[in-house]
Amino acid sequence: METPAQLLFLLLLWLPDTTGEIVLTQSPATLSLSPGERATLSCGASQSVSSSYLAWYQQKPGLAPRLLIYDASSRATGIPDRFSGSGSGTDFTLTISRLEPEDFAVYYCQQYGSSP
C-alpha cells in the first residue's frame, strides 16, 4: 500500500484591488493524499471577484510559480486536463482529478486586475 504524500496548500494570500483589499482564504491547509486520488482545493474571497480575474498557480521548491488556471476556469497552455477550475463570486475551486506524483506541490489562488 502506498504511503500518503503531503499536498501542501497555502492558507492565506491577499492582494490589493482597486476597490480595496480582497482577502483570499484557501482551504484546507494541507491534504494527505496518494497518487491516483482526487484533490479539491478551495479559495474564498472576502468580496465578490470577477471570474475573469481569478487564477491558480502551482509552485515547487526552488522554482517560480506556474500558472495553471486563469479566468477561474481556463487552463493555461500546456496544463493537463486533469486540472480544472470552477466557481464565481466569492467561492472558487481547483480540482485535480487524478493526482500524479509531480502534482504534489504548493497551490495558490490569486485575484488579479488584468491578464496574469
Curated annotation (Swiss-Prot):
Region ranges (Complementarity-determining-1): 44-55
UniProt-listed InterPro entries: Ig-like_dom, Ig-like_dom_sf, Ig-like_fold, Ig_sub, Ig_V-set, IgV_Light_Chain
Subcellular location: Secreted; Cell membrane
Domain Ig-like, chain residue ranges per copy: 21-116
Keyword terms of this UniProt record: Adaptive immunity, Cell membrane, Disulfide bond, Immunity, Immunoglobulin, Immunoglobulin domain, Membrane, Secreted, Signal
Sequence segments annotated as region (Complementarity-determining-2): 71-77
Chain segments carrying region Framework-1: 21-43
SUPFAM superfamilies, alphabetized: Immunoglobulin (SSF48726)
Signal sequence segment: 1-20
Region annotated Framework-3, chain positions: 78-109
Cysteine disulfide links: 43-109
GO annotation (BP), single: adaptive immune response
Functional description taken from the UniProt entry: V region of the variable domain of immunoglobulin light chains that participates in the antigen recognition. Immunoglobulins, also known as antibodies, are membrane-bound or secreted glycoproteins produced by B lymphocytes. In the recognition phase of humoral immunity, the membrane-bound immunoglobulins serve as receptors which, upon binding of a specific antigen, trigger the clonal expansion and differentiation of B lymphocytes into immunoglobulins-secreting plasma cells.
Assembly and binders: Immunoglobulins are composed of two identical heavy chains and two identical light chains; disulfide-linked.
Name of the protein this chain belongs to: Immunoglobulin kappa variable 3D-20
Species this chain originates from: Homo sapiens
